[in-house]
Swiss-Prot record:
It comes from Clostridium acetobutylicum (strain ATCC 824 / DSM 792 / JCM 1419 / IAM 19013 / LMG 5710 / NBRC 13948 / NRRL B-527 / VKM B-1787 / 2291 / W). The keyword Signal does not apply. Keywords: Cell cycle, Cell division, Septation. Belongs to the SpoVG family. This is Putative septation protein SpoVG. GO terms for biological process: division septum assembly; sporulation resulting in formation of a cellular spore. InterPro entries: SpoVG (IPR007170), SpoVG_sf (IPR036751). Pfam families: SpoVG. The keyword Cell cycle applies. Could be involved in septation. HAMAP family: SpoVG.
Length: 95
């Protein structure tokens, strides 16, 4: 399974959630609403989830092993940093 596209759909500087991302696998399957979160130990991803009636959050889709999670997280965070740096450069040149 290959990650064929990572799209940063929304970037925010407020709060702990920094971005919302969509990831495409093998040009055939997409997972939307993956969040980039800033935690105590740096950035990490949170898979799409829904709130259950008892207030607990359950993942809708998620990797079932650590290696796959790390592969997805690395691809997302690399694209996030790239897009964030492009936006910062664009803002600086407009000033």
């Amino acid at each position: 399974m290959q990650i064929t596209d990572v799209r940063i759909r929304k970037i925010t500087s407020e709060g702990k959630m920094k971005a919302i991302v969509s990831v495409t696998f093998d040009n055939e399957f997409v997972v939307h609403d993956i969040k980039v979160i800033e935690g105590q130990n740096g950035l990490f991803i949170a898979m799409p989830s829904r709130k259950t009636p008892d207030g607990e959050f359950k993942d809708i889709a998620h990797p079932i092993n650590t290696a796959t999670r790390e592969k997805i997280q690395s691809a997302i965070l690399a694209e996030y940093e790239k897009v964030k740096n492009e936006e910062e450069t664009k803002t600086e040149t407009e000033e």
